[in-house]
Regions:
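Bacterial N-terminal signal peptides that target proteins for export
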Residues: 1-11
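N-terminal signal peptide c-region/cleavage motif recognized by signal peptidases
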Residues: 19-20
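S-adenosylmethionine/decaboxylated-SAM
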Residues: 23
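Primary mode marks residue(s) on the alpha4-beta5-alpha5 output face of response regulator receiver
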Residues: 26-178
Length: 178
Protein backbone atom coordinates (compact mmCIF):
# COMPACT_ATOMS: atom_id res chain seq x y z
CA UNK A 1 0.00 0.00 0.00
CA UNK A 2 1.59 3.25 -1.11
CA UNK A 3 1.65 6.30 1.13
CA UNK A 4 -0.64 8.10 -1.33
CA UNK A 5 -3.21 5.29 -1.20
CA UNK A 6 -2.89 5.08 2.58
CA UNK A 7 -3.62 8.81 2.90
CA UNK A 8 -6.57 8.52 0.49
CA UNK A 9 -7.96 5.53 2.35
CA UNK A 10 -7.62 7.29 5.68
CA UNK A 11 -9.31 10.44 4.40
CA UNK A 12 -12.23 8.54 2.94
CA UNK A 13 -12.55 6.47 6.10
CA UNK A 14 -12.74 9.70 8.07
CA UNK A 15 -15.34 11.09 5.68
CA UNK A 16 -17.40 7.92 5.97
CA UNK A 17 -17.15 8.06 9.76
CA UNK A 18 -18.30 11.67 9.70
CA UNK A 19 -21.19 11.06 7.37
CA UNK A 20 -22.30 7.45 7.56
CA UNK A 21 -22.86 5.76 10.89
CA UNK A 22 -20.84 2.56 10.79
CA UNK A 23 -21.99 1.56 14.25
CA UNK A 24 -25.73 1.94 13.65
CA UNK A 25 -27.68 0.50 16.54
CA UNK A 26 -29.81 -2.50 15.57
CA UNK A 27 -32.59 -1.21 17.81
CA UNK A 28 -33.54 1.42 15.21
CA UNK A 29 -36.39 0.20 13.02
CA UNK A 30 -36.33 0.57 9.25
CA UNK A 31 -38.86 3.40 9.56
CA UNK A 32 -36.71 5.19 12.17
CA UNK A 33 -33.64 4.86 9.93
CA UNK A 34 -35.57 6.27 6.97
CA UNK A 35 -36.86 9.18 9.08
CA UNK A 36 -33.33 9.85 10.34
CA UNK A 37 -31.92 9.83 6.81
CA UNK A 38 -34.68 12.12 5.55
CA UNK A 39 -33.86 14.66 8.29
CA UNK A 40 -30.48 15.33 6.65
CA UNK A 41 -31.82 17.46 3.79
CA UNK A 42 -34.76 19.71 2.95
CA UNK A 43 -37.97 17.71 2.43
CA UNK A 44 -38.08 18.62 -1.27
CA UNK A 45 -34.85 16.59 -1.63
CA UNK A 46 -35.16 13.83 0.96
CA UNK A 47 -38.79 12.87 0.30
CA UNK A 48 -37.83 11.26 -3.02
CA UNK A 49 -34.22 10.28 -2.21
CA UNK A 50 -32.83 6.76 -2.17
CA UNK A 51 -32.24 5.75 1.45
CA UNK A 52 -29.32 3.44 2.27
CA UNK A 53 -28.45 2.00 5.66
CA UNK A 54 -24.94 2.57 7.04
CA UNK A 55 -23.76 -0.69 5.46
CA UNK A 56 -25.22 0.23 2.07
CA UNK A 57 -28.37 -1.90 2.37
CA UNK A 58 -31.25 -0.35 0.41
CA UNK A 59 -33.96 0.85 2.79
CA UNK A 60 -36.02 2.72 0.20
CA UNK A 61 -35.68 3.20 -3.54
CA UNK A 62 -35.75 6.84 -4.58
CA UNK A 63 -36.92 8.70 -7.65
CA UNK A 64 -34.52 11.64 -7.64
CA UNK A 65 -30.72 11.89 -7.83
CA UNK A 66 -30.08 12.07 -4.07
CA UNK A 67 -28.88 9.33 -1.69
CA UNK A 68 -29.37 9.68 2.07
CA UNK A 69 -28.08 7.70 5.06
CA UNK A 70 -29.37 7.74 8.65
CA UNK A 71 -27.55 8.91 11.73
CA UNK A 72 -26.65 6.75 14.70
CA UNK A 73 -28.04 6.73 18.20
CA UNK A 74 -27.92 10.01 20.17
CA UNK A 75 -24.41 10.82 21.33
CA UNK A 76 -22.75 8.62 18.69
CA UNK A 77 -21.32 11.51 16.65
CA UNK A 78 -22.86 9.84 13.60
CA UNK A 79 -25.13 12.21 11.72
CA UNK A 80 -27.59 11.77 8.85
CA UNK A 81 -26.38 12.85 5.41
CA UNK A 82 -27.82 13.32 1.90
CA UNK A 83 -25.44 13.34 -1.08
CA UNK A 84 -25.86 14.15 -4.74
CA UNK A 85 -24.25 11.81 -7.33
CA UNK A 86 -21.00 13.81 -7.44
CA UNK A 87 -20.54 13.50 -3.66
CA UNK A 88 -21.41 9.78 -3.80
CA UNK A 89 -18.91 9.26 -6.63
CA UNK A 90 -16.23 11.22 -4.75
CA UNK A 91 -16.69 9.01 -1.68
CA UNK A 92 -16.59 5.77 -3.65
CA UNK A 93 -13.70 6.79 -5.92
CA UNK A 94 -11.44 8.01 -3.15
CA UNK A 95 -12.33 4.98 -1.00
CA UNK A 96 -11.08 2.78 -3.86
CA UNK A 97 -7.83 4.75 -3.96
CA UNK A 98 -8.55 6.17 -7.41
CA UNK A 99 -8.05 9.76 -8.48
CA UNK A 100 -11.17 11.93 -8.53
CA UNK A 101 -12.03 14.89 -10.67
CA UNK A 102 -15.26 16.59 -11.55
CA UNK A 103 -16.38 19.29 -13.93
CA UNK A 104 -19.37 20.17 -11.76
CA UNK A 105 -19.98 21.06 -8.13
CA UNK A 106 -20.99 18.26 -5.73
CA UNK A 107 -23.49 18.87 -2.93
CA UNK A 108 -24.21 17.26 0.42
CA UNK A 109 -26.60 18.18 3.25
CA UNK A 110 -26.20 17.54 6.97
CA UNK A 111 -29.10 19.45 8.53
CA UNK A 112 -28.65 17.64 11.86
CA UNK A 113 -25.04 18.80 12.02
CA UNK A 114 -21.80 16.89 11.91
CA UNK A 115 -18.57 16.19 13.76
CA UNK A 116 -14.97 16.30 12.55
CA UNK A 117 -12.29 14.91 14.87
CA UNK A 118 -9.78 17.27 13.22
CA UNK A 119 -10.56 19.85 10.53
CA UNK A 120 -6.92 20.13 9.48
CA UNK A 121 -5.65 16.54 9.51
CA UNK A 122 -7.65 13.91 7.63
CA UNK A 123 -5.73 11.11 9.39
CA UNK A 124 -7.24 11.73 12.83
CA UNK A 125 -9.80 9.13 13.95
CA UNK A 126 -12.93 9.96 15.97
CA UNK A 127 -11.48 8.29 19.05
CA UNK A 128 -8.42 10.58 18.84
CA UNK A 129 -10.36 13.85 18.58
CA UNK A 130 -8.49 16.65 20.26
CA UNK A 131 -7.99 20.40 20.16
CA UNK A 132 -8.83 20.64 16.45
CA UNK A 133 -12.09 18.71 16.77
CA UNK A 134 -15.09 20.61 15.50
CA UNK A 135 -18.84 20.14 15.76
CA UNK A 136 -20.74 21.97 13.06
CA UNK A 137 -24.45 22.66 13.31
CA UNK A 138 -26.71 22.31 10.28
CA UNK A 139 -24.65 22.71 7.12
CA UNK A 140 -24.11 21.72 3.56
CA UNK A 141 -20.87 20.61 1.96
CA UNK A 142 -19.52 21.31 -1.52
CA UNK A 143 -16.93 19.59 -3.67
CA UNK A 144 -15.54 22.04 -6.20
CA UNK A 145 -14.19 21.23 -9.67
CA UNK A 146 -11.08 23.30 -8.95
CA UNK A 147 -9.26 23.73 -5.65
CA UNK A 148 -8.10 27.12 -6.94
CA UNK A 149 -11.65 28.34 -6.38
CA UNK A 150 -11.14 27.78 -2.64
CA UNK A 151 -7.89 29.70 -2.20
CA UNK A 152 -9.67 32.67 -0.59
CA UNK A 153 -11.43 30.54 2.04
CA UNK A 154 -9.97 29.71 5.44
CA UNK A 155 -9.24 26.18 6.53
CA UNK A 156 -10.08 27.06 10.13
CA UNK A 157 -13.73 27.14 11.29
CA UNK A 158 -12.76 29.73 13.91
CA UNK A 159 -11.78 32.22 11.19
CA UNK A 160 -14.81 32.16 8.91
CA UNK A 161 -18.41 31.02 8.78
CA UNK A 162 -17.69 29.23 5.49
CA UNK A 163 -14.49 27.20 5.63
CA UNK A 164 -12.64 24.34 3.95
CA UNK A 165 -12.04 21.00 5.65
CA UNK A 166 -8.62 19.47 4.90
CA UNK A 167 -7.40 22.73 3.33
CA UNK A 168 -4.37 22.23 1.12
CA UNK A 169 -5.05 18.56 0.39
CA UNK A 170 -6.64 16.95 -2.66
CA UNK A 171 -9.70 16.25 -0.51
CA UNK A 172 -10.89 19.77 0.27
CA UNK A 173 -14.57 20.07 1.12
CA UNK A 174 -16.31 23.43 1.63
CA UNK A 175 -18.48 23.61 4.76
CA UNK A 176 -21.37 26.10 4.52
CA UNK A 177 -23.22 26.57 7.84
CA UNK A 178 -26.96 27.06 7.43
Amino acid sequence: LSLDNLVKSTIVALFVLLSAPVAMADEMSKEEKIASAMSAAPARISKDATILDADGTLLREGTNRWTCKPGGPPGSRDYPICNDPVFVEWSETVWQGKPFSTDVVGYSYMLAGGFAPDVFDPDVEKSDAGANAHHEGPHMMLIMPSHDLLAHLSGDPKDEDIFVVFKGTDYEIVIVPL
